[in-house]
Amino acid sequence: MAHRLQLRLLTWDVKDTLLRLRHPVGVEYATKARAHGLEVEATALGQAFKQAYKAQSQSFPNYGLGHGLTSHQWWLDLVQQTFHQAGVRDAQAVAPIAEQLYKDFSSPSTWQVLEGAEATLRGCRKRGLKLAVVSNFDRRLEDILEGVGLREHFDFVLTSEAAGWPKPDPRIFHEALHLAQVEPAVGAHIGDSYQRDYKGARAVGMHSFLVAGPEPLDPAVKDSVPQEHFLPSLSHLLPALDYLEGSSARL
């Protein structure tokens, strides 16, 4: 008879898995700009942010830690680039807006806990599982999780800034497994990114589940993820864990 799998650790992505922004980035940026006397279209800022974020992440990955930057400075530079691409050339006028945005994005009021997150985390705890965060976030994450009432569910929070490696780098997953003192085969990761979360965890021998994010899934991605690994919502996780652990006994 096959040995029944008993998971011991669940690691979690955060943004668009457990939390999401209450308002789109462009709206947040435009609102703060208006409070400082600067009128910029939210749509233009949203588009500029996507372009600036991609460029900044490619030039200075993982908050520029390898280039001598702090995550704080990385974000201030990104805000400056966003406004510049949206047509605002006055860096001095943008500076206080950037500082305010950095502070506001640290606040729990900017974030919303996704439906089913708290109940699912409680359910996982009742199963005796260790829970941890593995997120490509910066040092503000601990305070954000504390502020929205989710920090108490986790044994530890591991950010890419603290670890030194962003997902899908296998080293951040190995570090989480080391901190939890469990083997990959009894760990599972939950997140909304196919590359960073689903594939990243599987590359180190963990199980993983893909959460439906705000954007439609690429059909090719959906075809490559078994139905039992796909979570239309967080409330589907506990039944998926039952199926995973039960299926090992049926092998």
From Swiss-Prot:
Give the family this protein belongs to, as stated in its UniProt record: Belongs to the HAD-like hydrolase superfamily.
Which residues are recorded as modified (N6-succinyllysine)? Answer: K15
Gene name for this UniProt entry: HDHD3
Show the CDD domains listed in the entry: HAD_dREG-2_like
Origin superkingdom: Eukaryota
Q: Which Pfam families match?
A: Hydrolase
Q: What is this protein called?
A: Haloacid dehalogenase-like hydrolase domain-containing protein 3
Provide the positions where the record notes the PTM N6-acetyllysine.
K15, K130
Cellular-component GO terms for this entry: nucleus
Which InterPro entries is this protein grouped with? HAD-like_hydrolase_domain, HAD-like_sf, HAD-SF_hydro_IA, HAD-SF_hydro_IA_REG-2-like, HAD-SF_hydro_IA_REG-2-like_cap, HAD_sf
What Gene3D superfamilies does UniProt report for this protein, alphabetically?
HAD superfamily/HAD-like (3.40.50.1000), Haloacid dehalogenase-like hydrolase (1.10.150.720)
* Keywords, alphabetical: Acetylation
